[in-house]
Curated annotation (Swiss-Prot):
Residues 38-106 form the KH type-2 domain. Transmembrane segments: none annotated. Keywords: Ribonucleoprotein, Ribosomal protein, RNA-binding, rRNA-binding. The gene is rpsC. This is Small ribosomal subunit protein uS3. Gene3D superfamilies: 3.30.300.20, Ribosomal protein S3, C-terminal domain. Part of the 30S ribosomal subunit. Forms a tight complex with proteins S10 and S14. GO terms for biological process: translation. Belongs to the universal ribosomal protein uS3 family. NCBIfam families: rpsC_bact. GO terms for cellular component: cytosolic small ribosomal subunit. Binds the lower part of the 30S subunit head. Binds mRNA in the 70S ribosome, positioning it for translation. The lineage of its organism: Bacteria, Bacillati, Bacillota, Bacilli, Lactobacillales. It comes from Lactococcus lactis subsp. lactis (strain IL1403).
Amino acid sequence: MGQKVHPIGMRVGVIRDWDAKWYAEKEYSDYLHEDLAIRQLIQTKLADASVSLIETERAINKVIVTLHTAKPGMVIGKSGANVDALRAELNKLTGKQVHINIVEIKKPDLDAHLVGEGIAKQLEARIAFRRAQKQAIQRAMRAGAKGIKTQVSGRLNGADIARAEGYSEGTVPLHTLRADIDYAWEEADTTYGKLGVKVWIYRGEVLPTKKSVKGEK
């Protein structure tokens, strides 16, 4: 059977950047576990804040965390109370000074993670999986997507045999490296067990910037 490579991992270094923008030699494993703990804490505390991407940067005794969210007001809280509480918890967790930057996602319907999260929540609310997928596809295409593909797998409608069923609209060129394809995988906890939700969104082409060479006229 043909297998698909991870669309984001394939494009890192071409049109996508790394989520963790740091490098270490001897402390690499410590920093990696620290990064995982930071991400887990943020995802737990901000489960309802539509956080799509968490980026980390490091300096000496300092960690810079950038949160991409569709609900910045919920992350910041009244007079910054929520973000201050989160910063204090991260400081305690890492033992370092943590800076938090918040970036608003202008079009959440073009973000694969948020679209997948929305479908998963609808499945948990017992909305039909076909309807949930088709509504998400319509919203993404209206928001300006060039193409979108969704797939829900598991015991659909409580069937004894698990299967996968998906829908697509437009084009999703997975082999084109310059194609800006966002991909996400989510889980929905239903009464019949877990359902997997996959979303691919094609947002158009991105041409890699040509790096100028010194002395080039």
